[in-house]
């Protein structure tokens, strides 16, 4: 790690100890040349910036390991909190499945999912149940942030305080860190740096162009050439004399960036936002708050749907009204007799439907009622009315049926009903 104090002391040592340069050899001379290059390049960028620090004077002095110092450091109160520690009891397959569910279903990233698992002491069931209770913090760099960074970089180059105006929720340290990770995904010839210098030269003029190229890194201004066209550069020719304008059409096509589908960014909107720092901060903060609010709504809807799905997994049997299981009763009350006649008027000879209407009488008992109480309630006339409305069917071909009597279902009737049934029973004629 390069410390700031060591860097400052290294600068002073490189400038003031010119008389003692023999002991350092060519390293000190090389470091002085790098200092000159960094000072010239920092004139174009922000104050405090510079080139690469190369040389012995820029290296940190690593002290010897001291157990007492290490012990005192571990006993500090402001130590960081451990968020994940692997456990041998959890297999890799289960861990991958847990992370996949946390990512796809709940929107967690890997670090957040593992932190939740570590909080519950590597209990996957408890962790999965607790994932619904929290809304994961959104990713630090979303797709929208990356597109805005590319657009801001195309306008302002490596002037990070201007880029911050378009991304007010990002610190300059975060912008610089993302810039170097983003830079690695681009061409090795540093197309971004060349594009940034081209934009700055167009704004500041040719005078600043010479000043910038003198302090730039030779690796950054190297242009892409075919392998057969590459030749060694003579010592007298300096790299800054190489011009980038040899392929203007290719540079224009290379500089074009298209945002993802569904996103657009007009130059008028960017200029309006960049005109005033306060206005840009307010507008972007409102948009960011709306985005976070929408994400929270989506997460709440997901949690609600998941809760409903869990409730429906057991089926609807728990919510179904339990039907009172009524036992069949052999006695016919007055209300049941009238209800049976009305059911015959409505359903005809559909004994099953009549049994369902009455509730506590079986199909056999309904058939017995049909035969026993035929004359008493004038059931034949009721059937004729039903047939007049619905027509005569195959089921209604016979007007009489014998009562079904089973020994195990023998019916004990009251004296009154038994006497009435004996008088009313009729048997079909021999014809």
Curated annotation (Swiss-Prot):
Lineage: Eukaryota, Metazoa, Chordata, Craniata, Vertebrata
Polar residues compositional bias, start-end: 17-28
Function: Essential component of the BHC complex, a corepressor complex that represses transcription of neuron-specific genes in non-neuronal cells. The BHC complex is recruited at RE1/NRSE sites by REST and acts by deacetylating and demethylating specific sites on histones, thereby acting as a chromatin modifier. In the BHC complex, it serves as a molecular beacon for the recruitment of molecular machinery that imposes silencing across a chromosomal interval.
Classification via PANTHER family: REST COREPRESSOR 1, REST COREPRESSOR COREST PROTEIN-RELATED
Tissue: Expressed in territories in which neurogenesis takes place.
Protein name per the record: REST corepressor 1
Domain of life of the native organism: Eukaryota
Coiled-coil annotated residue ranges, if any: 267-314
Keyword Transcription regulation attributed: yes
């Amino acid at each position: 790690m390069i410390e700031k104090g060591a860097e400052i002391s290294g600068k002073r040592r490189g400038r003031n100890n010119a008389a003692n340069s023999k002991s350092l050899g060519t390293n000190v001379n090389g470091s002085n040349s790098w200092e000159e290059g960094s000072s010239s390049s920092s004139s174009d960028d922000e104050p405090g910036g510079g080139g690469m620090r190369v040389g012995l004077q820029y290296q940190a002095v690593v002290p010897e390991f001291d157990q007492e110092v290490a012990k005192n450091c571990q006993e500090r109160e402001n130590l960081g909190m451990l968020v994940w520690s692997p456990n041998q009891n959890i297999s890799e397959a289960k861990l991958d499945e847990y992370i996949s569910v946390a990512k796809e279903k709940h929107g967690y990233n890997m670090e957040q999912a593992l932190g939740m698992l570590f909080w519950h002491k590597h209990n996957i069931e408890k962790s999965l149940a607790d994932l619904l209770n929290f809304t994961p913090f959104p990713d630090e760099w979303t797709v929208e942030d990356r597109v805005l960074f590319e657009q801001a970089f195309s306008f302002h180059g490596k002037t990070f305080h201007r880029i911050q105006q378009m991304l007010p929720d990002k610190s300059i340290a975060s912008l610089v860190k993302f810039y170097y990770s983003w830079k690695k995904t681009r061409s090795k010839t540093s197309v971004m740096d060349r594009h940034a210098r081209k934009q700055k030269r167009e704004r500041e003029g040719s005078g600043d162009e010479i000043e910038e190229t003198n302090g730039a890194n030779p690796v950054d201004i190297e242009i892409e050439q075919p392998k057969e066209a590459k030749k060694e550069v003579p010592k007298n020719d300096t790299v800054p004399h190489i011009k980038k304008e040899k392929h203007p059409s290719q540079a224009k096509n290379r500089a074009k960036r298209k945002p993802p589908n569904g996103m657009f960014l007009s130059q008028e909107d960017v200029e309006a936002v960049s005109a005033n720092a306060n206005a840009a901060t307010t507008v972007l903060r409102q948009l960011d708050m709306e985005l976070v609010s929408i994400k929270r709504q989506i997460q709440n809807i997901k949690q609600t749907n998941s809760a409903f799905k869990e409730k429906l997994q057991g089926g609807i049997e728990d919510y179904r009204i339990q039907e009172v299981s009524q036992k069949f009763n052999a006695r016919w009350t007055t209300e049941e007799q009238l209800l049976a006649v009305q059911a015959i008027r409505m359903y005809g000879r559909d004994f099953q439907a009549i049994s369902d209407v009455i509730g506590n009488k079986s199909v056999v008992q309904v058939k017995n009622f049909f035969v026993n109480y035929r004359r008493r309630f004038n059931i034949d006339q009721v059937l004729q009315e039903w047939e007049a409305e619905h027509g005569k069917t195959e089921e209604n071909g016979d007007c009489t049926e014998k009562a079904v009597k089973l020994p195990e279902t023998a019916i004990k009737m009251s004296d009154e009903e038994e006497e009435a049934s004996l008088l009313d029973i009729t048997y079909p004629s021999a014809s």
